[in-house]
Amino acid sequence: MKYKHLILSLSLIMLGPLAHAEEIGSVDTVFKMIGPDHKIVVEAFDDPDVKNVTCYVSRAKTGGIKGGLGLAEDTSDAAISCQQVGPIELSDRIKNGKAQGEVVFKKRTSLVFKSLQVVRFYDAKRNALAYLAYSDKVVEGSPKNAISAVPVMPWRQ
């Protein structure tokens, strides 16, 4: 019993700095007689470590009885688009390359083993941030991925 509490506590601590998505909207793709329809969901999140960068992710969400109960596994299909929405402030850790590949967003896409992740890279040569969206599993991930780049530009007032 102690181990369950320890694992749960560590999991919550590790997920703390990740961004939380806000659902912007969705469209139904397949009608289901029982349970919710299959759909494509559009969500937005702000990079938790880079002020004034917002990313939009679209992803498939499985419906039906299993989907309604949270037991279905969503497909690995996703798209991402990130934009500068104000003056960008980069920390020294990001500028020095110590945060390369850092997970900035994670969404569970199956009951236990699968998730959609977004990781950030900083391209110092081009002064740009690159955001990579991909799906992974405990045992095996998917090669499906999407990328969005945000050039770090001066913000006009």
UniProtKB/Swiss-Prot annotation:
UniProt keyword Signal, yes or no: yes
Entry GO CC: cytosol
Signal peptide range in chain numbering: 1-21
Record note on disruption phenotype: No crucial effects on activation of cre regulon gene expression during aerobic growth on glucose or pyruvate minimal medium or during anaerobic growth on glucose minimal medium.
The entry's keywords: Signal
InterPro entries on file: Uncharacterised_CreA
Protein name as catalogued: Protein CreA
